Amino acid sequence: MVIWNPWHGCHKISAGCANCYVYRRDESIGKDASIVTKTGDYNLPVKKNRQGEYKLTAQDGMVFTCMTSDFFLDAADEWRQGCWDIIRERTDLEFYIITKRIDRFEQCIPDDWGDGWNNVTICSTCENQERTDYRLPIFLKLPIKHREVICEPMLGEINMEKYLASGLIEHVSCGGESGDNARPCDLRWIQEVRRECIRCGIPFTFRQTGAVFIKDGRTYHLDRKLHISQAKKSGYSYVPGMGTANAIKYKLPERQALFERLQRSDFRNRFHLSDKDRNYIAEKGIDVIRSHAHDLILKRLSAENPENDGKQTPMKGHPVFIAQHATACCCRSCLEKWHHIPSGKVLTKDEQAYIVDVLME
């Protein structure tokens, strides 16, 4: 990995900027991060050694660009064309550009940009729902070959599935905020975006917990050295088809506590077996109904990413359908929220048996 900062300094424009790490670091050494200056590394990707060879090679990895500023900052307009010239010259390098200013993209690209350059990935940040709904519609309409989204610092629950469903976003990452004044990040927010990525078949990375992390309603204050390691340890990063979710450790809910919680749900309490349902069960026999439940779980819920998950009603009118909704076993999202079984993994035989037992109780 290479960091290329052709200029330094930035201007805060949204909620995600409030506790900017660049401002924190500059303030600690007596600098003003709002003053934007060209750096000595401006020509870094095209610098050569004494043999006339580029110092940076493709083996050095992705070139993360403008990590102490924003590539599309208006204060850097006079320097940007030179950077495009460098990126054009170094087609053997991959450049990664993160921005909060995706709305300035079209006025900042070079004349020969076309439908995008293969060696450039543009990553739009989305720290909350308001910025997501503003930036992503713009992002998806732009001529870009490689798009990614990063929710960091993640400041609230975000729903972006309608944007992910476009098929234009290649990767999503989320993470909490660092620093002494860090705002909290809730694991539930991370899990929801992760589930949306799974349903859309998009790789997801949980980058860091942040300094203030909420899990199961409990708030944890974490040392900086633990932010990344704890996120990695959680196992919540996801790569389709790679079995990554198998690393997630979880504990099934205690059965009595589960049913007490279900009884407190107005939605779950809407589902009751009718006399017709009970007669059907008596006619078929409990073993047949159990086999129906087992077949349903195996065929409709056991896959890593079930087709039409949460939208299918294959046994509507069947007692098992009623039980599915009453016990929150209707989709993989509910299985995670209510039963702690992670999304994005193939259900084991033990997990399938547990779900059948819950349905039949």
Predicted features and spans:
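The feature represents the first ordered module of a protein
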Residues: 259-312
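Immediate flanking context of iron-sulfur cluster ligation sites
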Residues: 1-14, 308-327
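Conserved Radical SAM active-site core
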Residues: 1-120, 129-132, 158-169
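Short, compact, well-ordered microdomains
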Residues: 83-87, 91-96, 104, 206, ...
